[in-house]
Design a protein with these regions (language model features):
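Long, low-complexity intrinsically disordered regions
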Residues: 1-228
Length: 228
């Protein structure tokens, strides 16, 4: 358990505050005990019908401008605070802007199509993205694999969730993810502000931070979280 944040979460603001204090926070439980939104959230709020819980909070948190959200940890959802986004992106991108990664033969054509579509639009709903690039029956396959990889590499993130509405204007169902680049949400200058550091230096900075708030976690466990 963290030394700095042990309170349970009861609101989107509380979730954002936890992300800002931890710096990095997976959505689901993992090898590090207590280091997840799932464990910080009271069980009765996890899938409550009559009150908002973490599934509803993730949208406001993602669009708050205070944290990065997406499939960031072991191909599963999580948050990174605004303070740590530059080092996180520098480490995960390993010194490559997406164009440079493509030029060096380190990205697939499908990844390139998805990245360019999102970057070109600014923001793009997953439904429209699939339609635009023919990810439908009889068309392209592997959408989830590609979009998850782009998030893990920090080239793409989730900006918000858009919900269907009933005839009374009330949202319902699972929200449709709206994708964007981190540069679109936080600005190019912030995202690239750690580029002058070696990617391993960014990793060490993040390791030191997490070690200070998760003293019971091993270096191997922290490395696994940061590498994804």
């Amino acid at each position: 358990m963290s030394k700095r944040y042990a309170r349970q979460l009861h609101s989107a603001d509380g979730l954002i505050a936890a992300v800002e204090q931890y710096g990095f926070l997976p959505f689901f439980r993992n090898e590090i005990h207590g280091f997840s939104i799932e464990e910080l959230c009271p069980p009765e709020l996890w899938f409550a019908d009559d009150v908002d819980g973490p599934w509803e909070w993730k949208g406001p948190a993602a669009r708050s401008g205070k944290c990065l959200y997406g499939k960031l940890f072991n191909k599963k959802a999580g948050f990174v605070s605004r303070e740590w986004i530059p080092d996180f992106a520098n480490f995960r991108r390993d010194g490559y802007d997406f164009d440079a990664r493509w030029d060096d033969g380190l990205a697939s054509y499908k990844d390139k199509e998805l990245y360019e579509a999102i970057a070109g639009e600014g923001r793009m709903l997953s439904k429209r993205l699939k339609e635009t690039l023919n990810y439908r029956k009889g068309g392209n396959t592997g959408f989830e694999t590609c979009i998850t990889r782009l998030q893990m590499q920090s080239y793409v993130c989730i900006a918000d969730f858009v919900y269907m509405q009933d005839r009374y204007g009330r949202p319902y169902g699972w929200g449709v993810a709206e994708y964007a680049t981190p540069e679109e949400l936080f600005g190019y200058d912030l995202i690239t502000s750690a580029y002058q550091r070696d990617s391993q230096e960014s990793k060490e900075r993040m390791m030191q931070h997490l070690s200070s708030i998760l003293p019971g976690a091993s270096a191997q466990q922290l490395t696994k979280i940061l590498k994804g």
